[in-house]
Regions:
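Active-site region of glycoside hydrolase catalytic domains
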Residues: 1-98, 104, 115-136, 160-166
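Residue-level preference for long, well-ordered alpha-helices that form the structural scaffold
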Residues: 29-33, 102-110, 143, 147
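Arginine residue identity/basic-tract feature
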Residues: 35, 39-42, 51, 111-113, ...
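Alpha-helix boundary/interfacial micro-motifs
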Residues: 69, 73-75, 101, 149, ...
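Surface-exposed substrate-engagement region within the catalytic domains
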Residues: 109, 113-125, 136-159
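Aromatic-rich peripheral "rim/lid" segments of glycoside hydrolase catalytic domains that contact
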Residues: 140-232
Length: 232
């Protein structure tokens, strides 16, 4: 609780992520996990009643396990449930990849997991977010067409569901040692943050063209980094 005492009631935009993914004993003992969350939440909120707290279900933060979380009453505005989907991209599972070319079955499987979280939100009144997702475990070169399609679909589905999300991991897009964005991955990052999504009734692949934006008002991550690096 040292961190909670250190910040007290300052830095209101700061939230505490208690356990990114429950593992070991807590991953197999729901009662113990709920007790840990309950005690920690009460202690933190005794210091700052408005502090935002993130908690994750077991089974590696699976959305299917959200109903087993026991959340304190009247905590809808301060406790956010965190769940994960493809935190390291669509890796092979049981000999199969969950995403290849974006088939109807592959898209339906992803929508089903998102809908699981939506139904939990509607039933409990709590809000959830995706604590991390990625189009690939390690991306250093220009993304493939499959990765771009996956990123666009995931981002659009989560935005349509009004579920906020974090991107895993920032080091794939930003080189901390060099202090610069990785230009080859800029299209992928832009797609994950602000995807061009199809609207209802719109034919697949056809998007409304946006008017050109003056160069002075649009600065890409790579350009922003470059400008900072050359300023005195």
């Amino acid at each position: 609780m040292a961190v909670a005492h250190y910040f007290g009631q300052s830095s209101p935009l700061l939230g505490f992520d208690l356990i990114y993914e429950p593992s070991d004993k807590l991953n197999h003992n729901q009662a113990s996990l709920n007790r840990v969350y309950d005690k920690t939440i009460r202690t933190i909120h005794a210091i700052d009643p408005q502090r935002m707290i993130f908690i994750a279900p077991k089974l590696h933060a699976a959305p299917e396990d959200l109903p087993n979380l026991k959340l304190p009453p009247q905590s809808q505005n301060t406790v956010l449930a965190q769940w994960h989907i493809f935190p390291w991209g669509p890796l092979k599972n049981n000999g199969k990849y969950p995403w290849t070319s974006g088939t109807a079955a592959e898209k339906a499987a992803i929508r089903a997991r998102i809908n699981t979280a939506i139904h939990w939100q509607q039933k409990t009144g709590h809000v959830s977010w995706v604590g991390g997702w990625s189009p690939g475990e390690t991306i250093r070169n220009a993304p493939s067409a499959s990765q771009m399609a996956f990123a666009r679909f995931m981002a659009c589905e989560l935005k349509k569901a009004k579920i906020p999300y974090a991107i895993n991991a920032d080091t794939q897009f930003y080189d901390g040692e060099e202090g610069a964005w990785r230009p080859a991955l800029e299209p992928l990052l832009n797609t994950m943050i602000a995807p061009e999504c199809e609207k209802p009734g719109e034919k697949p692949g056809h998007h409304t063209l946006k008017p050109p934006v003056p160069d002075a008002t649009r600065v890409t991550p790579a350009e922003a980094s470059k400008q900072k690096s050359i300023s005195p």
